[in-house]
Design a protein with these regions (language model features):
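Post-transcriptional modification and biogenesis factors for structured RNAs
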Residues: 1-150
Length: 150
């Protein structure tokens, strides 16, 4: 799970808790809109922080170097994705990328993604879901396809 420039501490805290529950690594890519020690971030994650496998990358370039060395496909979640997250075939080692609450994934990084997916909206007037909700939806679908959910 990769968050690019997250801005809202409670969203990141909720995502950290979801990652802890699923034993999923959480990669935060700076700059962040808050300090890692932010009380709202900690509060949202409650007492689950010891279970979070957290990695911090100062810049997008730093993350890209790490991701290339580690292998796996970069899957960008964006409202302009090329296919529905439900129709996509996830593989072990995929990196699920989510952008900031206000700007999404930067265009230059989105262009480097191996694939892009979107979460369908029934109401055209609603542009997107909350970041922590979107992450949970994408993560649980990938885990379901990979056989981690029974």
């Amino acid at each position: 799970m990769v968050l690019i420039n997250p801005q809202i501490p409670p969203n990141t805290g909720n995502i950290a808790r979801t990652c802890a529950a699923t034993r999923t690594e959480l990669h935060l890519v700076g700059p962040l809109g808050f300090e890692i020690s932010d009380r709202y971030l900690k509060r949202a994650g409650l007492d689950y922080w010891p279970y979070v496998k957290l990695m911090y990358h100062l810049t997008i370039d730093d993350f890209c170097v790490y991701q290339q060395k580690s292998g796996g496909r970069a899957i960008g979640f964006t409202v302009r994705g090329s296919s529905s997250y439900l129709e996509y075939s996830y593989q072990s080692g995929d990196w699920l990328l989510f952008g900031s609450e206000t700007d999404g994934i930067p265009a230059d990084l989105l262009n480097q993604c191996d694939d892009t997916v979107y979460i369908p909206m029934a109401e055209p007037g609603v542009r997107s879901l909350n970041l922590s909700v979107s992450v949970a939806i994408g993560l649980f679908e990938a885990r379901r396809q990979l056989g981690f959910i029974r």
